[in-house]
Amino acid sequence: PAADTAFYSLDRACPKCGLSLPELDPRLFSYNSEMGACPKCSGYGIITDAIRKAIRKGEAMGSEMHAADETEIVCRACGGTRLNPIARNVRWAGKTIPEVCAMTAQEASSWFENLELDDRSRTIADDALLEIRSRLTFLTEVGLEYLTLERSAPTLSGGETQRIHLASQLGTNLRGVCYVLDEPTIGLHPRDNAMLLSAIERLTKKGNTLLVVEHDEETIRRADHIIDIGPGAGIRGGRLMGQGTVEDLEANPDSPTGRMLAHPLPHTGTPQRRVKLNDPELKTLVFRGVHARNLQIDEITVPLQRFTVVTGVSGSGKSTFCREVLFENLSRRLKDAQAPLVGTDQLTGFENVGRVLEVDQTPIGKNSRSCPATYVGIMTAIRDLYAATNEAQARGYDASRFSFNKAVGACPVCAGQGLRTVEMNFLPDVKVLCEACAGKRFNPETLEVLWRGKSIGDVLEMEIDEAVDFFASMPSIAYPLKLMQDVGLGYLTLGQPSPTLSGGEAQRLKLVTELAKVRTDGSFAARAPHTLYVLDEPTVGLHMTDVDRLSKVLSRLVDAGSTVVVIEHNLDIAADADWIIDLGPEGGAKGGKVVAQGSPKMVARKNTATGIVLRAFLAEHKPVKST
């Protein structure tokens, strides 16, 4: 053949190198399919210890290969994209599928809207593009425009997962469906609430029913019908306190929610503790050259011994700053003053902090034996109290006899757990009340020792509200119990197993342990060093009355000399802050900057997303002048 002859193949094979490619199939672009998954990591994008062992042994890999406590490294073969080399190199409109999936929903929506296709490509892609564009629009409407399309489901918050499910339903034409939503506004900035509520109302207009569990005031006011359950929590709740429209509840004196709607908490917007950054008396943390993830901040100041709220629209960089910059660098520098910084070029003022603690919503206690009484540290005092009774001393019982973790005093049948595990063969195991001790955890002899007519088993079954009065004469026990009451946990029992507590309950119990250390009631000397606390949305799951309690508790920590930094969207909390740091102006690549900072009143004067909603909020919550 002539030297300039070129050979082409109709069978997706290269005549020069011999490479043969399979026919393009939708499964080729799915990492859940063996056809599309990276052969090295089996479509996980990461290599864990279990996966490495399976590879060495030549075993098949399943979902159990991804354990939370294992070390993970990004798969070098696919670079974390999860796909095989063929799928990674197919381009459409100039982009590969990993490049498209790395976009946020907002970026992808813009890219798909502005595609320039020839007539043939448009004819082929029109139906698919219509579906893609509408689904991306739905994600934006429920406030998830900042999420990347490749985001792994386990990394999503509960609120984000719920809103993704909601977005998927917006694209259907179903009628007569009853949707149940549990706090869909979690993690949403108040500005974005309106979009979410509009999306919810669209579902109702299609002929569907929505039952929404919610504490957000705006959501409650937009509801067609409200059912108020109360009046308290635990055994003090469960009763219908009122139902009807907002006006019906506001006129109902028995409705706790109605009272809060009719008489909102007053806020002046003026902080309790003034912040003047040029005041030489004020100690501060100053970060310069912050560049973590989407953050691009020249300088950001956090006043110490103040209550600071970091706010901003979803995806603006709040968690990145508080966790990956502030918390991470303080933790490093408090261990080693010369430790390298991450995500920031310079940090000054860290020497004024004694310790840093993230009070998060992870479960407390390592096993089911942990309970509120053991976690806050009063169980030891309770055991000592029972060991000091005449009956215990006459029998020769010491404090260990009153521990359900010790065989000498624990029920021999359930080993001090109060529950027995019943194996169900092919079904999950079931826990049932122990018949021997009736759930009291102790053996009969130990339960015969009484203090004020109650056994130690009876004490563990007490609600905290009852226990406050019962132990009123014992300050070392009563004080932490009163603190638990103050943070709205009075309905918990002292012996409630820790795994049954919600994330919000666990977070508030952690706050109680810190308050118990600083002894802010004046009757005990402070024991804790200057601590900086970082909290991420502590108001999740709280009723409006409990939010007020929480705000007062956080202020008590600051009054005791600590620093509190809170990531929060709740406007009641923001209005009570000494200092607000507002990040934005949008989420993702359009965020990451300080758009406003100052007192609530100062931020409310700005035309930022937070400033606009805070201005309206303060106007609606002005204190009523007494005549």
Question: For each predicted feature, which ranges?
Answer:
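Conserved phosphate-binding elements of NTP-dependent enzyme cores
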Residues: 1-627
